[in-house]
Amino acid sequence: VQFYIDGAKSGKGEDMKSAFHKDATIFGYIGEDLFAGPIQKLFDWNDKNGPATELKTEITDIDIVGTIATVRLESDNWTGHKFTDFFTLLKVDGTWKIMNKVFYLHT
């Protein structure tokens, strides 16, 4: 999850890629529009959005069972926006990878 945060701060999708499995997905709403699909959509959005140098994050929950886990991340001031993310992770070849990200954009 730290690679994800680092990529958000740098504004470079490439910096967050290693946090995710290559087949990861993303789902959430931006306004009335469903933002859904392959995780590449997040990387592309992050590249367009730019650096979030003032981003503040807090992991508020972690639950691990064997080779699966969930993480809740609160992000404040991602270029002026506040997000709540839920990640599902899987340990793949000994490394934790984010398999899915669902998010809520606070208004």
Q: Locations of the language-model features?
A:
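Solvent-exposed, amphipathic alpha-helical segments
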Residues: 3-7
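Short beta-strand segments enriched in hydrophobic/aromatic residues
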Residues: 20, 75-77, 102
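Short beta-strand edge/turn micro-motifs at domain boundaries
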Residues: 82-107
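Beta-strand-connecting loop/turn residues
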Residues: 22, 67, 94-95
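Short, well-ordered alpha-helical segments enriched in acidic and aromatic residues
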Residues: 10-23
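Hydrophobic residues in alpha-helical segments
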Residues: 8-11, 46
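Surface-exposed, charged secondary-structure patches
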Residues: 25-30, 36-82
